[in-house]
Amino acid sequence: MATPNDQDLALHGMNAKQGGKILLLACGALAREILDILTINNWLHIDLQCLPAIFHNHPEKITPAIEAAIGKYKQGYEKIFVVYADCGTGGALQRLCAAQGVEMLEGPHCYSFFEGNRQFAQRDEFTAFYLTDFLVRQFDAFIWKPLGLEPVSYTHLTLPTKLAV
């Protein structure tokens, strides 16, 4: 299966249909990792459909997009799994999945399920910030620019080349 480019994953998602009986509806930010797992295990019975990763910056778009995808694909698959945690939907995604009879990942967000939900819940504060290869390559588009934290340029400063003694 071809590796998708980051720009497509960020803005459009992807469809890795190979005739499987199970569909994974996932975040585009996790596409490469999921594709690697499918390939390594030769799981040809599983198809992957990813929503645009940029939805993490607009969590209100996740639930309607998952609902549309379930409606579009439900008849063509024996089982659909949603590879999202709550991801800022305020429980809306969980309620949708329960109503549709579709399983999803547990937890508040991917940081929690990466670490393990039980271990994550026991902590009073974050002890790790998880970066997938996708997020590292898309850090400007997903973090700096949307949060108004564009890196400060220090090119205007002149540093002394010799210290006075």
Show where each model-derived region lies.
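N-terminal basic/disordered segments at the start of proteins
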Residues: A2-I40
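Gly/Ser/Thr-rich loops at beta-strand to alpha-helix junctions
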Residues: L25-R32, F55-H56, V83-L93, H109-S112, ...
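Short, surface-exposed basic-aromatic patches at helix termini and helix-loop junctions that form
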Residues: T39-N42, Q94-L105
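A short beta-strand-loop structural module common to alpha/beta enzyme folds
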Residues: H45-N57
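Glycine-rich, highly charged phosphate/nucleotide-binding loops
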Residues: P59-G71
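Short, high-confidence coil segments that cap the C-terminus of an alpha-helix
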Residues: Y77-E78
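Long, charge-dense
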Residues: A99-W144
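Conserved small/polar residues in nucleotide/adenosyl-binding loops
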Residues: T155-T161
